[in-house]
Amino acid sequence: MRQFQDKKVLVTGGSRGIGKSIARAFADQGARVAINYRSNAAAAADCLRELGGKGNIALQADIADPAQAAMLVEDAISGLGGLDIVVNNAGIYLWHPIATADFSDWIAAWRQTIDTNLLAAASICYCAAQHMMRHGGGRIVNVSSRGAFRGEPDGPAYGASKAGLNALSQSLAIALAPHNIFVGVVAPGFVETDMAAEWLEGERGDAIRAQSPLGRVARPEEVAHAVLFLASPGAEFTTGTIIDVNGASYLRS
Ligand code: NAP
């Protein structure tokens, strides 16, 4: 029996990068997965093909819009026939250094980042929790970032959005435990995906890899491994925890 046999899982931003690895790892363990994406339908179709099996679906929604986020949860529930696990993985990073960004760009970056990285997760947690509370419980895993702790000098809204996501997750861990809903967080450092490609392939690439004593950044599967652990049977008492997946590049205690 595979660990997530017949579990119904929604992964936001599940069409590429870390989300795709998370979707694949759940599918490999027997789950039925709904992958959400914003606009790249071709990547979502490729991902769905790679997942193989039956019953996986791709759902387009711009989750920065709360109405679309709510509809996404409804569509996932009806398309999968229920919802046991939600992974809030979709996120964006926008460059807006305070020394050079003009005020309107600064505000636009803050709004877009908070709407995508924090408000979307809050919307989806709300809608998913309503379903889970009526159906005996569930799991929520949120994908945060090392930047929440270490700071993001060129993308302060990103760091703030992920710190907010950590606080949201921990508040919900307390609020939802009596309803048998457990909430965990995974906080990666740099990961080999499109989001980080420009840095990793650029002149700072070697310095970034050297931040870890392993001399490299994370692979998406390594983040997925931590996500599946938090969603697995037996991990209930870890609720409220934040797992670092940063290769000891930033240590906190
Ligand atoms: P990625 O390769 O850029 O992929 C982003 C995914 O999110 C895509 O599927 C994208 O869909 C989707 N997405 C973005 N905005 C969306 C929206 N408004 N509505 C719905 N879907 C949306 O990103 P990644 O590197 O895998 O990152 C995944 C998560 O890990 C993010 O939360 C990120 O902050 C976090 N993280 C990443 C790193 C890193 O180094 N890569 C480090 C720490 C944390 P489309 O393709 O359709 O746009």
What are these regions (language model features)?
Residues 8, 15-17:
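Conserved glycine-rich cofactor-binding loop
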Residues 177, 182, 238-240:
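Short, small/polar-rich loop/turn modules that mediate ligand/substrate recognition or access, typified
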Residues 145:
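Residue(s) in the substrate-gating loop at a strand-loop-helix junction
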Residues 130, 174-175, 236:
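Alpha-helical segment proximal to the catalytic Tyr-Lys
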Residues 92, 103-122, 137, 141, ...:
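Catalytic Tyr-X3-Lys loop
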Residues 150, 214, 228, 239-253:
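Short C-terminal tail/terminal secondary-structure segment
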Residues 125, 161, 169:
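Active-site helix of classical SDR
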Residues 70, 93-111, 134, 154-157, ...:
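Conserved mid-core segment of classical short-chain dehydrogenase/reductases
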